[in-house]
Regions:
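Gram-negative host-targeted secretion-system effectors, predominantly Type III and Type IV
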Residues: 1-183
Length: 184
């Protein structure tokens, strides 16, 4: 599959859940279509990450917020983290990736998925067409966003919102109960 074909993935297909098992497992459990779709979207996410880094890098500065938000909006933070963790694991030897990011990548479950020749299939969705130092900056930002999502309490409705919703419900019921000729 060509990179241009992968970029044509619709937003509907980009919402496919991350399949975290190997192809062998998928075959054994009749889940091969789910594996293939997830793999295809992982490659599209890789391309989107590389494009976002290229587009967000100006004057020796990477706008990590813009790049992360752009790709997360299209693929979801779980897939972005999965693809980036896979990339960092593959570049474990590279000094341009921080120790903290390397340690984080080890906490993200990525299965071993070797093909019949012993090559790791996850290598197909490595973010490798940009400088690893820029990938490191983006990984740090994604980790911050993940921590923010995790620490943010679920949005609770305010008392005013509850009163307004209740008032609207009461008014709707009252309007239904009014009989013709009883209008004031």
């Amino acid at each position: 599959m060509e990179r241009n074909d992968i970029q044509k993935i619709s937003s509907e297909t980009a919402n496919i859940p991350v399949y975290k098992q190997s192809a062998e497992y998928a075959i054994e459990h009749d889940e091969l279509p789910a594996y293939r779709e997830s793999f295809r979207v992982n490659m599209a996410c890789r391309d989107a990450l590389e494009s976002a880094i290229h587009e967000s890098y100006h004057d020796y500065c990477l706008d990590t917020g813009k790049a992360a938000a752009q790709v997360a909006a299209q693929f979801g933070m779980e897939r972005v983290a999965y693809v980036l963790a896979n990339t960092v694991r593959a570049f474990d030897h590279d000094g341009r990736i921080s120790r903290d990011n390397k340690a984080w990548a080890q906490t993200v479950p990525v299965c071993t998925d070797a093909d019949e020749w012993g090559h790791e299939r996850s290598r197909y969705f490595l973010v490798s067409q940009v400088n690893p130092g820029l990938v490191n900056l983006l990984v740090s930002r994604v980790r911050e966003e993940l921590a923010r999502e995790k620490d943010a309490p679920a949005k609770r409705s305010s008392v005013l919102e509850k009163i307004q919703k209740n008032k609207a419900a009461v008014q709707a019921k009252a309007a239904e109960k009014k009989l013709p000729g009883q209008e004031r």
